[in-house]
Regions:
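NTP/phosphate- and nucleic-acid-binding module
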Residues: 1-304
Length: 304
């Protein structure tokens, strides 16, 4: 439908590039045998975008798309083990639409953008979409399985099929270049990638439950509730375990859930208005005041 929006009025070379972005839910009738949890679903959400530009702008626009990927994956989500795959057509021309010149131009535009980006990439023959070359973002799970997280295409056929044009400086109608990008791919699928990439041990800022308050007994309940309210007031995702179970069992179960920080509260902590901190992977961090604990995690609670 963004093609229809683009077509809704005449476009000049001065208007380009035009970028449309949206969050949209897509539905596909996948066969039941191919469905696989969050990795392959019948309904999924994407941060979809289409960029309409002149051919001489396409390289720079594609470069910016690659930089956006690098920002999301490395700086926000901390994914280091990845590479880009430039997917090319096979030698069997019957499987791909368009003419060789169009393919060659599109491939060279993407190839130059990839080289300028500095990102590691390989070229894979026969992996292109039927309508144009693409760049696939390949990541590995914690067990080394490789998956495609997102795909970005330079679609030169859309201009023909949907009559997407602009007027150049001489008033001549020319086909526009269309870049399709979805940096996170399917959000449901990307969540599955994150779970596998981190093996469930999410960084603090991403963890569904960041802090678990563990009460040793009923007598410390009021102090635990006070701590919980203060943590939540600070916009931290905190929970309280005040079940009638041993503290050892509570700690084991919380560690199995891979919660980043546990605050163990007993009579001593209640009396001194402190918290006993346990950090995932590091164990006991000692007793400290709540403010000192909050200062300690201040940087970790935000993407680095």
């Amino acid at each position: 439908h963004t093609h229809m929006i683009y077509r809704s009025e005449p476009r000049s070379y001065r208007d380009l590039p035009i970028r449309y972005a949206e969050y949209g839910t897509v539905y596909r009738h996948e066969r039941s045998g191919t469905l696989a949890g969050l990795l392959r679903t019948r309904g999924f959400t994407q941060n979809d975008a289409h960029i309409y530009c002149r051919e001489d702008q396409a390289e720079e626009e594609f470069l910016q798309v690659m930089k956006l990927h690098e920002f999301w994956y490395t700086q926000i989500f901390g994914i280091k083990d990845f590479y880009m795959r430039l997917s090319l057509p096979s030698k069997d021309k019957t499987k791909f639409a368009g003419v060789p010149r169009e393919w060659n131009v599109a491939v060279e535009i993407i190839r130059r953008a990839m080289r300028r980006s500095g990102l590691r990439f390989i070229e894979a023959e026969g992996e292109a979409a039927f309508y144009g070359p693409k760049v696939d973002f390949q990541i590995k799970s914690v067990i080394g399985r490789e998956e495609t997280a997102s795909t970005n295409q330079l679609d030169f056929l859309a201009a023909k099929r949907f009559e997407l044009t602009y007027r150049d400086r001489n008033g001549k109608e020319k086909p526009v270049s269309v870049i399709h990008r979805a940096p996170l791919g399917s959000h449901e699928r990307f969540v599955a990638f994150l779970i596998e990439h981190y093996a469930g041990a999410f960084p603090l800022w991403l963890a569904p439950v960041q802090i678990m308050v563990l009460a040793i007994n009923d007598k410390v309940g009021p102090y635990c509730q006070e701590l919980l309210r203060e943590l939540q007031r600070r916009d931290l995702r905190a929970s309280l375990d005040e079940r009638n179970e041993t503290i050892g069992r509570k700690i084991r179960e919380a560690e199995m859930q891979k919660i980043p920080y546990l605050l163990v509260i007993g009579p001593r902590e209640q009396q001194s208005k402190t918290v006993a901190v346990r950090e995932r992977g590091k164990g006991d961090r000692g007793q400290m005041r709540l403010e000192a604990f909050l200062d300690m995690i201040d940087k970790a609670k935000r993407p680095q």
